[in-house]
């Protein structure tokens, strides 16, 4: 498999403003065409209107970044932190500071310094465990080196294993070390069974620690570590959205023993300044969305512009990715619209016709479509061609044929699922997953991401030479399964075709609980593959920025679908809290 070729195709409160809630009395709507005296009974998912409407988004104002003094402080603090980072001595002290910078969300200011420090530590790898045999230090070194693409073996933890093959009993009370060990275990790759066993061991002991702590009053110096353990058990840092984690950690960091006040103050100011930038971007994107007028014609689709923008913040929040966020927000909204048309509203005849028109990619065929589909096709056609123009202008390559093809592939899988629903077909688990990795929309998302993000695109990197690139397939598997775990029960209740959980149950006679455990295991295995790609990022011909963004997409997916359908029904999950903390609620200064 050629590592540099990507396969994207079929081979593969703050005063939150709530609109008045609308209620839909039934699950089907009637549609009579003016041309034919035929009445179609169309389904409806009863999606609620947006929680944040256009006027509310336009009213956003971040009071913490208006003062010139705040911006001046940010510049001063930024350089003071840089000076501290460059002057700090001792490997463990350097690792601790890098970890704090990352968790506080300000490490993007010091990418070169961090890389140089980690490269030197990697060149001297093994000194920490040889000198200290400290579980926390060894684990943190392992985490940061793998996180930044340096090669380090799981054998680094062998020094903590007794002659009986188990972790030494003296580690039982080393909660700080066990927490770092637990976090390190999530960087496992395929066949690294020792790390997988380590995860089970650390999880068990940390869970016992939380249970024991609930029976007593924690000392002040234990509060920080207890909160960190609870957070990790809920979501390991490696699987968490970086911006969301930074917002949480800023509040927790001040409880840490020997915390650095300079880092804390700079992190708070920087978070608010970035949040203000994101709010301005969201206003512009909301204005674009409002100007399309689509929601006046397509009242059956999910109006989720804020949620879609939140996805892009999870993928890359840094200022230099403003254009990428704009493009991806548009792609997410296009996917949502088309998914709802295929999944809920369109008739089979309409969907087959629409798929055919998209494959031809010719506006001369638009008159064959019903009116609502004409609008959708022209919207898709114009937006994708504009992206293609931007890439041609900036990078000299015509990507429109590739973009058109990946949308065609996506709609063909949507159509397949619609046929399954109409005919009552129950696919095998393998059949479902072969279709599902494409219908997940990940190949579509990643192709657009690669086109606008990479400076080294070519026909070769976009051509389907490798039938199943590991990055694309692994990310697609995670989104497909995470989405199914969160939404399949509700979708089955409204009569949808079987999802992965049900297909696995039918095929293996497993219980729903067993099937869900299997899906979680597949998600974990997919992360192992992604970890392998991240570990070899420095030698991969794929841009590291692309690999990191793909991993971040998985983090958003698992966050959005952890407690239910956080995109379609955010009010029923924690998505509302997540969005408010990242986009609307500044850090008090």
From Swiss-Prot:
- Enzyme class (EC, first level): lyase
Q: Which InterPro entries match?
A: Isoprenoid_synthase_dom_sf, Terpene_cyclase-like_1_C, Terpene_cyclase_plant_C1, Terpene_synth_N, Terpene_synth_N_sf, Terpene_synthase-like, Terpene_synthase_metal-bd, Terpenoid_cyclase/PrenylTrfase
The EC designation for this entry is 4.2.3.-, 4.2.3.46
Instruction: Output one GO BP term.
Output: diterpenoid biosynthetic process
Expression induction per the record is: By coronalon. Also induced in response to the caterpillar P.xylostella feeding.
Alphabetic keyword roster = Chloroplast, Lyase, Magnesium, Manganese, Metal-binding, Plastid, Transit peptide
Catalytic activity, as annotated: (2E,6E)-farnesyl diphosphate = (3E,6E)-alpha-farnesene + diphosphate
Q: Which of this chain's residues are annotated to bind Mg(2+) 3?
A: 483, 487, 491
Primary location: plastid
User: Which region of this protein is its transit peptide?
Assistant: 1-25
Does the record bear Magnesium in its keywords? yes
Q: Please give the cofactor(s) recorded in the UniProt entry for this protein.
A: Mg(2+); Mn(2+)
Detail which positions bind Mg(2+) 1: 339, 343
The biological pathway it contributes to is: Secondary metabolite biosynthesis; terpenoid biosynthesis
Offer a single GO CC term for the protein.
chloroplast
Pfam families per UniProt: Terpene_synth (PF01397), Terpene_synth_C (PF03936)
A GO MF term: magnesium ion binding
Q: Where does (2E,6E)-farnesyl diphosphate bind?
A: 302, 339, 343, 480, 483
**Disruption phenotype annotation:** No formation of (E)-beta-ocimene detected.
Subcellular localization(s) per the UniProt record: Plastid, Chloroplast
- Can the keyword Transit peptide be found in this entry's annotation? yes
Role noted for this protein = Predominantly involved in monoterpene (C10) biosynthesis. Using GPP as substrate, the major product is (E)-beta-ocimene with minor amounts of (Z)-beta-ocimene and myrcene. Using FPP as substrate, could also be able to synthesize in vitro sesquiterpenes (C15) with (E,E)-alpha-farnesene as the major product and with (Z,E)-alpha-farnesene and (E,E)-beta-farnesene as minor products.
PANTHER family on file: (RAPE) HYPOTHETICAL PROTEIN, OS04G0344100 PROTEIN-RELATED
Q: Which family does it belong to?
A: Belongs to the terpene synthase family. Tpsb subfamily.
UniProt remark on domains: The Asp-Asp-Xaa-Xaa-Asp/Glu (DDXXD/E) motif is important for the catalytic activity, presumably through binding to Mg(2+).
Q: What is this protein called?
A: (E)-beta-ocimene synthase, chloroplastic
Q: Which gene encodes it?
A: TPS02
């Amino acid at each position: 498999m050629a590592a540099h070729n990507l396969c994207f195709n079929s081979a593969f409160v703050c005063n939150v403003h709530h609109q008045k809630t609308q209620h839909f009395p039934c699950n089907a709507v009637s549609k009579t065409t003016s041309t034919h005296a035929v009445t179609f009974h169309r389904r409806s998912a009863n999606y609620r209107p947006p929680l944040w409407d256009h006027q509310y988004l336009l009213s956003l104002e971040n009071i913490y970044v208006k003062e010139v003094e705040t911006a001046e402080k940010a510049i001063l603090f930024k350089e003071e932190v840089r000076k501290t980072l460059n002057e700090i001595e001792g490997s463990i002290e350097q690792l601790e500071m890098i970890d704090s910078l990352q968790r506080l969300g300000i490490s993007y200011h010091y990418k070169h310094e961090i890389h140089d420090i980690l490269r030197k530590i990697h060149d001297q790898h093994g000194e920490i465990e040889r000198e200290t045999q400290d579980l926390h230090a060894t684990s943190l070194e392992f985490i940061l080196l793998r996180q930044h693409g340096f090669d380090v073996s799981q054998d680094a933890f062998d020094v903590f294993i007794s002659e009986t093959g188990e972790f030494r009993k003296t580690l039982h009370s080393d909660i700080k070390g066990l927490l770092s060990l637990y976090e390190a275990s999530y960087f496992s790759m395929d066949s690294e069974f020792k790390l997988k066993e380590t995860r089970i061991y650390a999880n068990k002991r940390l869970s016992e620690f939380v249970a024991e702590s609930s029976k007593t009053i924690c000392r002040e110096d234990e509060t920080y570590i207890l909160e960190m353990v609870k957070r990790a058990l809920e979501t390991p840092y490696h699987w968490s959205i970086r911006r969301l984690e930074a917002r949480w950690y800023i509040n927790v960091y001040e409880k840490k023993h020997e915390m650095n006040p300079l880092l804390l103050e700079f992190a708070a100011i920087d978070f608010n300044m970035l949040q203000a930038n994101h709010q301005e971007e969201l206003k512009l994107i909301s204005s674009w969305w409002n100007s399309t007028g689509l929601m006046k014609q397509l009242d059956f689709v999910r109006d989720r512009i804020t949620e879609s923008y939140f996805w892009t913040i999870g993928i890359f929040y840094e200022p230099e990715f403003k254009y990428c966020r704009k493009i991806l927000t548009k792609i997410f909204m296009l996917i949502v619209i088309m998914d709802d048309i295929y999944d809920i509203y369109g008739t089979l005849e309409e969907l087959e016709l629409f798929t055919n028109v998209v494959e031809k990619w010719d506006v001369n065929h638009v008159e064959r479509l019903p009116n609502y589909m004409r609008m959708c096709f022209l919207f898709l056609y114009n937006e994708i061609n504009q992206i293609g123009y931007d890439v041609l202008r900036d990078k000299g390559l015509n990507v429109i044929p590739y973009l058109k093809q990946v949308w065609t592939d996506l709609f063909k899988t949507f159509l397949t699922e619609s046929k399954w629903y109409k005919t009552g077909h129950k696919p095998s688990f393998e059949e479902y997953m072969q279709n599902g990795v494409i219908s997940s929309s990940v190949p579509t998302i990643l192709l657009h991401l690669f086109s606008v993000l990479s400076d080294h695109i070519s026909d070769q990197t976009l051509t389907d030479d490798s039938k199943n690139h590991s990055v694309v397939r692994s990310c697609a598997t995670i989104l497909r399964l995470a989405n199914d775990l969160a939404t399949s029960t509700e979708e089955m209740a409204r009569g949808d075709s079987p999802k992965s959980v049900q297909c696995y149950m039918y095929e293996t006679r497993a219980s729903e609980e067993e099937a869900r455990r299997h899906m979680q295991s597949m998600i974990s295995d997919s992360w192992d593959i992604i970890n392998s790609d991240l570990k070899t990022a420095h030698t991969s011909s794929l841009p590291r920025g692309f690999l990191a963004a793909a991993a971040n997409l998985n983090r958003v997916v698992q966050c959005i679908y952890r407690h239910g359908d956080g995109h379609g029904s955010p009010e029923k999950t924690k998505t509302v809290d997540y969005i408010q903390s990242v986009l609307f609620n500044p850090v008090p200064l």
